[in-house]
Amino acid sequence: DVEIILVDDGSTDGTARIADEYEVAFPDIVRVVHKKNGGHGSGVNKGLELARGIYFKVVDSDDWLDREAYLKLLARIKEFCGEKESRKIPDLFICNYIYDHLDEGKQRVMDYKNVFPEESMCDWNGIRHFRPSQYLIMHALIFRTEVLRKSGVKLPEHTFYVDNLFSYQPLP
């Protein structure tokens, strides 16, 4: 059900060895690619190029996933993308997230309850207004892989803060 693509872009801290160990331990799930460092965008581009799944989610090296929330998300994806051929599968799943400010010892919860109907699918007409403090970042998004590819999104290399390109360019 899940494919994990680990993109090692020239890490010097033992990441490459650890990634390779995961690939050996979980060969049906984990694929590793080693490449020259090209920055965050380059790693995302490589992952998208190699992705074989219906959906694509970026998880950076400093991100973490809550197991219970992750399993709930997988169940929701399966529910919406069930075996009913007549059903249109969603182009995008949007998830709440927690932003950890480790330096300050603070957390900020970003939820979208006021924007999107909870636990259901909607179209553009079902979206309400964002608060000024709310925005979509790549870590809250799970795009259908085909949507990303058709959009032609390609993140710049050696550039920080490329979330807006990834988050908004694929939208109609």
Residue ranges and their predicted role:
Residues D1-P172:
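Nucleotide-sugar donor-binding/catalytic module of glycosyltransferases
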